[in-house]
Regions:
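N-proximal low-complexity "stem/linker" segments adjacent to membrane-targeting elements
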Residues: 1-30
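Active-site-proximal specificity loops/subdomain of glycosyltransferases
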Residues: 48-100
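Short aromatic/hydrophobic "clamp" motif used to bind/position activated sugar donors
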Residues: 106
Length: 324
């Protein structure tokens, strides 16, 4: 089944100018909208940004000027100074945009990314096999490899997918983004003088892990609360790998047709990130044994780099923890 572009809405979420400490490449959102008109003619464009943003000349089909929920307090340092992240801004701009979608399919894209092709549309249905016991989405959701991490500090980790780009059924994207806002972390006076954050004194989860853990636990009550970045077990790792094989299609940006601004483009593939071949091997293992991919194929591209770099990353992390 081919998907008609008119059955797709594209939610562009985030600021269109530099905002609250986040820099923005001038004209990038204009470029984003123009790229959608070029590569998805007939699709509905929804820009979901903030009150007070100058949207002159952007001309989306639907413009949402959301009330800014502000940054979320997620930590306190030893001096009691709060650390903040944009958890709720990401949720509000994404979820409110998706709630305006009336088409069966939707794209969620950052306001500082753009399209270079529409290859992701066909890719969404190119890997139809599922592991029935692991199906949480109605159909596959396409996401990209950039910042989708398999390793942190030389260790395998779980629940750290990329949040740059999603394409799939609108109902499935809402499963990811329509989640409750995160409350500010309250300062605990009994822990004054020590850092306070999720997982302390261990290394706290990455922001993407916290998002993913929230929506995955909403979909499956057996998923544990992720206390720290490296929380893992053979059972949890297998669960996560089955999930991404059965519910996602993980592609390189160029396979999707996703354009990234310069600061998101690495000089070479990062060894700690998943690659499409990694995902394809998991898809073969859990969903479709006929797929032609092997561990040696991965070794020839990124595997040898991991063998060289990950042990040193692990040793460096352990030394850092000892110094604490």
């Amino acid at each position: 089944m081919s998907i008609d572009f008119k059955d797709i809405s594209v939610v562009i979420q985030g600021p269109v100018q530099a905002y609250q400490g986040r820099s923005q490449e001038p004209g990038i959102t204009h470029k984003c909208i123009a790229s959608i008109r070029t590569h998805l003619p007939g699709a509905t464009i929804i820009l979901s940004t903030w009150e007070g943003q100058d949207c002159h000349g952007l001309n989306p089909d639907i413009l949402l000027l959301n009330k800014d929920p502000g940054a979320t307090i997620v930590s306190y340092n030893a001096k009691g100074e709060p650390g903040k992240l944009n958890f709720n801004r990401q949720i509000v701009s994404s979820a409110e945009g998706l709630k305006q979608v009336t088409t069966p399919y939707a794209v969620k894209i950052r306001s500082d990314n753009f399209l270079t092709s529409n290859d992701f549309v066909a890719a969404q249905q190119a890997f139809p096999a599922r592991n029935d016991a692991s199906k949480l989405f109605t159909q596959k959701v396409v996401t990209n490899t950039s910042y989708f991490r398999r390793y942190a500090d030389g260790q395998k980790i779980v629940m750290l997918p990329s949040d740059f780009f999603h394409f799939g059924l609108t109902e499935d994207l809402l499963k990811i983004w329509d989640i409750p806002l995160f409350p500010d972390r309250e300062f605990d006076p009994t822990k004054a003088g020590s850092p306070q954050y999720r997982g302390a004194p261990k290394v706290g989860p990455h922001a993407e892990q916290i998002y993913c853990n929230a929506w995955l636990r909403k979909l499956d009550s057996t998923v544990p609360y992720l206390q720290h970045r490296h929380q893992n077990s053979p059972e949890l790792l297998a669960y996560w790998e089955r999930f991404i094989a059965s519910n996602l299609v993980v592609l390189e940006p160029e396979q999707i047709g996703l354009g990234l601004i310069q600061r998101f483009i690495p000089k070479s593939k990062r060894p700690n990130e998943i690659c499409h071949q990694d995902w394809l091997l998991l898809y073969k293992q859990y969903c479709d044994p006929s797929i032609a991919i092997s561990k040696f194929d991965i070794f020839k591209t990124i595997g040898w780099k991991r063998m060289c770099k990950l042990p040193f990353s692990y040793i460096k992390h352990q030394l850092t923890q000892i110094k604490k």
